[in-house]
């Protein structure tokens, strides 16, 4: 073996040892630096799920941050302001149960105010009480809404004067029981409306837990409402007697 070959082998071995030494001594320092960097970062504030109407007004707010509840003012007829439209107002502030659905924008998108208004009109909803949309009993508007639709951003209303600038992550549909018809009939009117709104707005339908609304959940809701309707049927106090 020539001297040149031995020299090349020696240089290669020294090079390998040098690279290994650099890697060995630099890796712990880098890790320590990363640990210190993480410690120096202030802890992020953890946002707990909200159960109130205090929702951020940011148009890009994620639907995951939306509270699974309905603003109290929307089920309380005593909250009417002077001069406010009362079409869609409930005749009483009593309610037993609320069925809630969402239509949410797809990822990286929002729902535009103008599009919401057009879609609501196409699905037979009327703008009214509390400045939100309602589905009313045809020919009997005084009976109150079958269900209503609101913005998920507080206070839940639609500002028609600035509707062109409105962009929100989702809208909510709520069926307040007792309704002006049986609970199951009200649901059968609400569900296709919500699905059609999602189609018109290119959105997705979510349940009250903000999960995709599937057939199994729909079946469970129907069962719940059938049970509710049975509970509302009061048996006669006195049986008809035979003479």
Swiss-Prot record:
Keywords: Cell cycle, Cell division, Cell inner membrane, Cell membrane, Membrane, Transmembrane, Transmembrane helix. The chain crosses the membrane at residues 5-25. Residues 26-243 are cytoplasmic. Its main location: membrane. Residues 38-49 have a biased composition (Basic and acidic residues). One of its GO terms (biological process) is division septum assembly. InterPro entries: Cell_div_ZipA, ZipA_FtsZ-bd_C, ZipA_FtsZ-bd_C_sf. Coiled coil: none annotated. Residues 1-4 are periplasmic. Residues 32-89 are annotated as: Disordered. Essential cell division protein that stabilizes the FtsZ protofilaments by cross-linking them and that serves as a cytoplasmic membrane anchor for the Z ring. Also required for the recruitment to the septal ring of downstream cell division proteins. Belongs to the ZipA family. HAMAP family: ZipA. Interacts with FtsZ via their C-terminal domains. This is Cell division protein ZipA. The lineage of its organism: Bacteria, Pseudomonadati, Pseudomonadota, Gammaproteobacteria, Lysobacterales. The gene is zipA.
């Amino acid at each position: 073996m020539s001297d040149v070959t031995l020299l090349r082998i020696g240089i290669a071995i020294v090079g390998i040892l040098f690279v290994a030494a650099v890697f060995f001594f630099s890796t712990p320092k880098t890790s320590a630096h990363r640990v210190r960097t993480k410690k120096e970062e202030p802890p992020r504030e953890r946002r707990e799920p909200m159960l109130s109407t205090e929702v951020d007004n940011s148009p890009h707010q994620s639907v995951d941050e939306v509270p699974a509840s309905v603003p109290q003012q929307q089920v309380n007829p005593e909250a009417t302001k002077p001069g406010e439209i009362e079409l869609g107002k409930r005749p009483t502030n009593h309610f037993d149960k609320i069925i809630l659905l969402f239509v949410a924008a797809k990822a990286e998108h929002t729902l535009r105010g103008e599009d919401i208004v057009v879609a609501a009109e196409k699905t037979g909803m009327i703008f009214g009480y509390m400045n939100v949309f309602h589905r009313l009993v045809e020919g009997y508007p005084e009976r109150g809404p079958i269900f209503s639709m609101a913005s998920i951003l507080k206070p839940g209303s639609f500002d028609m004067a600035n509707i062109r600038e409105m962009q929100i992550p989702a809208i909510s549909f709520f069926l307040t029981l007792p309704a002006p018809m049986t609970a199951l009939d009200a649901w059968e009117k609400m569900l296709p409306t919500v699905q059609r709104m999602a189609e018109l707005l290119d959105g997705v339908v979510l349940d009250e837990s903000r999960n995709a609304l599937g057939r199994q959940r729909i079946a469970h809701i129907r069962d719940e409402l059938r049970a509710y309707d049975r509970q509302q049927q009061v048996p006669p106090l006195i049986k008809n007697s035979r003479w």
